[in-house]
A protein has these predicted regions:
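Aromatic (phenylalanine/tyrosine) cluster motif
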Residues: 3, 24-31, 35
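Short, Lys/Arg-enriched N-terminal segments with co-localized hydrophobic residues
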Residues: 31-48
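Terminal helices and disordered tails flanking the catalytic cores of nucleotide-processing hydrolases
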Residues: 183-269
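Divalent metal-dependent catalytic cores for phosphoryl transfer on phosphate-bearing substrates
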Residues: 75-76, 99-214
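Acidic/His-rich, divalent-metal-binding segments that scaffold phosphate/diphosphate chemistry
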Residues: 45-129, 140
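Extreme N-terminal basic, low-complexity initiation segments
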Residues: 2-9
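N-terminal amphipathic/hydrophobic targeting modules at extreme N-termini
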Residues: 11-21, 25-26
Length: 269
């Protein structure tokens, strides 16, 4: 069959038209598929974050195994209680600090998670437990499908919480430090023989109550402690915990606050 020149032109136009339509539908289909995938990813992230909450991880059996092991290690070494009661208190207190300061619900949830996980490293060794705990938390959070930016925020806070090597550098690390260092109370002492108390036992046993209060108007965060001075004087308390108090001062500054320590109604720092 022979084609005339005009026929070849018409066929060429037809092919161009078909190719153009094909490209249009291809691009349109790709766009729709991309939109659907992005929507599914967003939904998946939302689903993960709904599951990845302080309340949920607090009931994660595998996580609690390591926290319990860490507490047993510290018990054998003569340390105060570092059980889930401590980590839960730190989680709740840290969350309250950021909530009081107006941070969004997501930030509050992240600091609660960091607070609950912060002592994981004690299951390996008390020495450098902040860093080993951060690495352990990384694996848990990655396995649970947490977004990288959330994992980074949580493990950074955990890695900075120990006074021997850490420093507050952002709201999460600051709130975690303040919550952890303010958990001073009599029932953390496991030693039942007062004559054999070490300095930490003595301070904790002397603490009849301790409360952390945030005054957003005056921009002050105050640790109020009621001490039994027959066991530990206010000056002794400050001397023993001076490094921790300096860490709290820095943490408060990161949050735009001043740190105050009040014992039995008297300002110590």
């Amino acid at each position: 069959m022979n084609f005339q020149a005009d026929d070849r032109i018409n066929i060429s136009k037809l092919l161009d038209s078909v190719e153009a339509k094909h490209n249009f539908y291809g691009i349109f289909t790709l766009f729709i598929h991309s939109f659907v995938i992005l929507k599914r990813l967003a939904q998946k992230r939302n689903d993960i974050m709904k599951k990845l909450t302080y309340e949920n991880i607090a009931h994660a059996k595998e996580l609690n195994v390591y926290l319990e092991q860490g507490n047993r290690v510290l018990d054998a070494l003569g340390y105060t209680d570092h059980s889930q009661k401590h980590t839960a208190k730190v989680a709740v207190t840290a969350g309250k600090i950021l909530k009081k300061l107006g941070y969004d619900a997501h930030m509050v949830e992240l600091v609660r998670i960091a607070g609950y996980m912060h002592d994981l490293g004690n299951s390996i060794n008390r020495v450098d437990h902040a860093h080993t705990g951060a690495l352990m938390a990384f694996h848990f959070l990655r396995d649970w499908g947490a977004p990288p930016e959330d994992i980074a925020a949580i493990i950074s806070a955990i890695g900075q919480h120990d006074e021997r090597s850490g420093i507050a550098f952002d709201p999460l690390s600051a709130a975690l430090i303040l919550a952890d260092k303010s958990d001073v109370r009599r029932d953390r002492v496991r030693n039942t023989v007062p004559e054999t108390f070490d300095k930490h036992d003595r301070v904790n046993y002397a603490a009849l109550s301790s409360k952390l209060h945030v005054d957003t108007h005056k921009k002050v965060i105050t640790l109020n402690i009621e001490l039994d001075e027959s066991i530990c004087s206010m000056i002794d308390y400050f001397e023993i915990f001076s490094q921790r108090m300096l860490m709290c001062k820095r943490a408060a500054e990161v949050l735009g606050l001043r740190f105050k320590l009040v014992a039995n109604g008297n300002k110590i720092a």
